[in-house]
């Protein structure tokens, strides 16, 4: 049975490696350049992979905190992205009426 008090990284170390390989792939680099106008920053994935591997060897608290901080920063970055448009709470009041081709769109 696994020890419940033993800390594990939020991801398996191989997941960090896979993310880094995906980030460096030609297809992903092209997609990021097309979408954002620049190549993706992939070094954080490799740094996290190396930190995770080092943590597996030494079980150092500094490495543990570095991995936790990296994941926290990554999650905060995802949550700060705002949607393209505001979500509405209710449908428009006249949603059920047939469309009028002569009516100008808003």
Curated annotation (Swiss-Prot):
<dbReference type="GO" id="GO:0043083">
    <property type="term" value="C:synaptic cleft"/>
</dbReference>
<dbReference type="GO" id="GO:0048167">
    <property type="term" value="P:regulation of synaptic plasticity"/>
</dbReference>
<dbReference type="GO" id="GO:1900272">
    <property type="term" value="P:negative regulation of long-term synaptic potentiation"/>
</dbReference>
<dbReference type="GO" id="GO:0045202">
    <property type="term" value="C:synapse"/>
</dbReference>
<feature type="region of interest" description="Disordered">
    <location>
        <begin position="67"/>
        <end position="106"/>
    </location>
</feature>
<comment type="similarity">
    <text>Belongs to the UPF0545 family.</text>
</comment>
<dbReference type="Pfam" id="PF11326">
    <property type="entry name" value="PANTS-like"/>
</dbReference>
<dbReference type="InterPro" id="IPR021475">
    <property type="entry name" value="Pants/Emi1-like"/>
</dbReference>
<keyword id="KW-0964">Secreted</keyword>
<protein>
    <recommendedName>
        <fullName>Synaptic plasticity regulator PANTS</fullName>
    </recommendedName>
</protein>
<keyword id="KW-0770">Synapse</keyword>
<comment type="function">
    <text>Negatively regulates long-term potentiation and modulates adult synaptic plasticity.</text>
</comment>
